[in-house]
């Protein structure tokens, strides 16, 4: 659903990436994939290339694999051409993402986070209905993960165009807790859990953020939750720590 961010979790080999590539249409698969495109349901795997690009865009685990031109400007211009949009569209998306990249910069000379932002802008140039992100936090530090949370929420909300449905696969439970609305857990190609990210992660020790384990049994998943807890009027004591009473 547009405006939502859903997380796919599961151990290696559970089928997360395979599902994403099947949705995108790059791999043969059985069953049906239906995307609500321009008011009707359609299978992106059966659409022509231009229509499929407007339905689903995928950012793979190694986002830099999609970058092959020598400058940011050329990458943006090529994306505009392939998406059939006015010149400058991809560059404008970068600006809306609040990411400033010199036009003459070679993508190979950029940080992992900068390359990811460029690939996101390229994939968003077609204004897709669904955006797929496969392990987007790989190689990112805490500050960039925080920035990525802002970017992903903006994509879902329509900050870069029309609101999109975002589906991301990750092992990063802290990122999932701060970024996603819903979490689906997969095992050997099957769904074994599906619900709000908070309920799924707190009910499964294997997918619970470290911060939730430290503050158990309090309902804590994120740093923001900790700040709210610390600022409550009464002191809260646990086996691991004591939070001070607010004066």
Residue ranges, per PLM feature:
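ABC ATPase nucleotide-binding domains
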Residues: 1, 207-241
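Conserved ABC ATPase "signature" region
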Residues: 85-102
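A short, surface-exposed alpha-helical micro-motif characterized by mixed small hydrophobic
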Residues: 176-178
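ABC ATPase NBD Q-loop/coupling interface
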Residues: 34-51
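H-loop/switch region of ABC-family ATPase nucleotide-binding domains
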Residues: 170-171
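Conserved beta-strand-loop-alpha-helix hinge in the C-terminal portion
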Residues: 190-214
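Walker B catalytic motif
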Residues: 106, 135-136
């Amino acid at each position: 659903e547009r405006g939502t961010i859903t997380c796919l979790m599961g151990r290696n080999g559970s089928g997360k990436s395979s599902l994403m590539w099947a949705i995108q249409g790059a791999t043969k698969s059985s069953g049906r994939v239906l995307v609500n495109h321009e008011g009707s349901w359609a299978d992106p795997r059966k659409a022509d290339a231009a229509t499929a690009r407007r339905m689903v865009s995928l950012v793979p685990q190694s986002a830099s694999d999609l970058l092959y031109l020598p400058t940011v400007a050329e990458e943006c211009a090529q994306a505009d051409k392939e998406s059939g949009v006015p010149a400058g569209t991809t560059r404008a998306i970068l600006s809306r993402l609040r990411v400033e990249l010199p036009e003459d910069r070679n993508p190979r000379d950029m940080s992992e986070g900068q390359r990811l932002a460029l690939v996101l802008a390229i994939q968003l140039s077609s204004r897709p209905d669904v955006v797929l992100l496969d392990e987007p936090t790989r190689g990112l530090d805490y500050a960039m993960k925080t920035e990525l949370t802002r970017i992903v929420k903006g994509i879902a909300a329509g900050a870069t165009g029309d609101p999109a449905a975002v589906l991301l696969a990750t092992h990063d439970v802290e990122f999932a807790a701060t970024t996603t609305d819903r979490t689906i857990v997969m095992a050997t190609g099957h769904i074994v859990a599906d619900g709000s990210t908070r309920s799924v992660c707190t009910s499964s020790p294997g997918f619970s953020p470290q911060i939730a384990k430290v503050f158990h049994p309090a309902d804590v998943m994120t740093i923001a939750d900790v700040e709210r807890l610390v600022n409550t009027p009464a002191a809260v004591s646990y086996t691991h720590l004591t939070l001070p009473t607010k004066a």
